């Protein structure tokens, strides 16, 4: 009904030729309507990252492409199954360390409407944006629609994993979605050389833009498994490209990343070994964007100070003790369990099955939970709490409490372990709900 009212009231602007004064009026009107809806959504307690974008999609489908075309350095797109939000945050902060103004979809809302909503927070009332470049995290399927409207100048393709088979079908279909992004990229494609579905000749042969890659020293490939190494004997066909960026060594949060013919030691604030891989990919993309103008020292200093994206290893303080939120999916869960020592931590696991989480819970059986056997799990919650509890039972992990109600389970975790650090592994929608609940106990950064 809202869309019908808007079209009737302002139809002459949206049906007019897309040039000159009418185009300017359309941009201004769309911006004002979108900002109004965004503010109303926030007043009602939402993040303002979904409804405003949906309204924009319905009334003015060209708004995003028209706005992004203003940017002198164009668009860098980041996609893949795992690591998009954190890698995007790293790329943004590294580019900002070089003096650039960067637009990004900071909330991690990685559908096209999320980009539209994020733009509404950055443009002035006439739809003008003050930025040099856009760095956008996009879901694989929505990235395909995005590149039909506006071709990215650069793209970074992280990985292809099977945790979204209920959405995309066969894993090869996910690779095809990313291939479509790659062939529509105009200046440079950066890909994960250790993922055989992204580095195979079938994937790269018809990509016309220059190729760069990132990866890890071969001795660490088992630590960072691709989907094929987890589920088959398929061997990587990875090729080395001229401008490679490689994670050569790491221990805890210290890493040595090689590029430009030199090894660069770095200490990161980001916890989790998967973030070392994300950082390596981010550096590769920033190098592709800036070329010889890159100030390496400034970039590495910025990298050492980057903090986790919300819900991705984010650390809150409750009663003087840390409480970590760790977003999980199949590959992410495996690497998170390998990254974080459970000793002395009270652990909660919260799993939902909404569209953004993935509805097929069979992936839980791909994760090895043996590392939690000694410490056990304090609480299991979320829509799929009992599926998760059953999975833990098979790995002989002790569980204190199971309840599908996140508020009840969170209260159990906090009240039983007031003087102990806490860690919550959670799926995407569970993470969003838990951040709202945690605001009752401590300060939680509001995401707009």
Predicted regions and their residues:
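A generic structural signal for short, well-ordered alpha-helical segments in conserved domains
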Residues: 88-92, 102, 283, 389, ...
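Acidic, Mg2+-coordinating active-site environments of NTP-dependent enzymes
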Residues: 157, 161-319
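Buried hydrophobic packing segments
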Residues: 91, 95, 115-119, 279-289, ...
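Phosphate-binding loop of NTP-binding sites
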Residues: 11-14, 18-210
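Structural beta-sheet core signal
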Residues: 136, 155-157, 191, 213, ...
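Short, acidic/turn-prone active-site loops that include or flank metal/cofactor-
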Residues: 107-110, 159-163, 216-219, 351-354, ...
């Amino acid at each position: 009904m809202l869309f019908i009212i808007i079209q009737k009231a302002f139809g002459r602007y949206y049906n007019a030729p897309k040039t000159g004064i009418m185009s300017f009026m359309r941009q201004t009107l769309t911006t004002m309507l979108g900002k109004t809806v965004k503010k109303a959504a926030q007043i009602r307690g939402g993040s303002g990252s979904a409804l405003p974008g949906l309204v924009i999609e319905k009334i003015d489908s060209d708004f995003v492409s028209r706005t992004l075309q203003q940017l002198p350095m164009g668009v860098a797109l980041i996609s893949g199954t795992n690591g998009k939000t954190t890698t995007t945050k790293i790329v943004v902060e590294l580019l900002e360390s070089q003096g650039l103004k960067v637009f990004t979809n900071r909330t991690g809302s990685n559908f096209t409407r999320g980009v539209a909503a994020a733009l509404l927070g950055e443009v002035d009332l006439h739809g003008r944006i003050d930025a040099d470049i856009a760095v956008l995290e996009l879901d694989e399927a929505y990235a395909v629609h995005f590149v039909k409207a506006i071709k990215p100048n650069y793209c970074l393709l992280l990985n292809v994993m099977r945790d979204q088979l209920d959405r995309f079908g066969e894993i090869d279909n996910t690779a095809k979605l990313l291939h479509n992004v790659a062939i529509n990229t105009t200046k440079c494609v950066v890909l994960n050389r250790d993922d055989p579905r992204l580095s195979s000749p079938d994937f790269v042969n018809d990509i016309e833009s220059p190729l760069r890659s990132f990866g890890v020293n071969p001795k660490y490939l088992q630590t960072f498994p691709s989907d094929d190494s987890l589920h088959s004997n398929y061997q990587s066909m990875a090729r080395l490209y001229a401008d490679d960026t490689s994670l050569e060594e790491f221990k805890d949060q210290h890493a040595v990343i090689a590029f430009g013919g030199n090894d660069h030691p770095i200490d990161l604030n980001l916890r989790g070994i998967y973030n070392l891989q994300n950082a390596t990919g981010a550096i590769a993309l920033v190098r592709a964007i800036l070329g010889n103008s890159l100030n390496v020292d400034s970039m590495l200093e910025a990298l050492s100070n980057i903090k986790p994206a919300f819900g991705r290893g984010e650390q809150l303080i409750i009663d003087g003790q840390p409480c970590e939120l760790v977003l999980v999916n199949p590959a992410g869960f495996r690497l998170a369990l390998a990254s974080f020592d459970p000793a002395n931590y009270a652990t909660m696991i919260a799993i939902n099955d909404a569209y953004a989480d993935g509805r097929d819970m069979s992936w839980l059986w791909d994760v090895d939970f043996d590392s939690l056997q000694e410490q056990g799990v304090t609480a299991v919650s979320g829509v799929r709490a009992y599926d998760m509890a059953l999975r833990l039972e098979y790995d002989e992990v002790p569980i204190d409490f199971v309840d599908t109600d996140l508020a009840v389970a969170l209260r159990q975790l906090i009240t039983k372990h007031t003087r102990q650090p806490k860690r919550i592994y959670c799926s995407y929608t569970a993470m969003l709900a838990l951040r709202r609940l945690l605001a009752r106990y401590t300060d939680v950064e509001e995401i707009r």
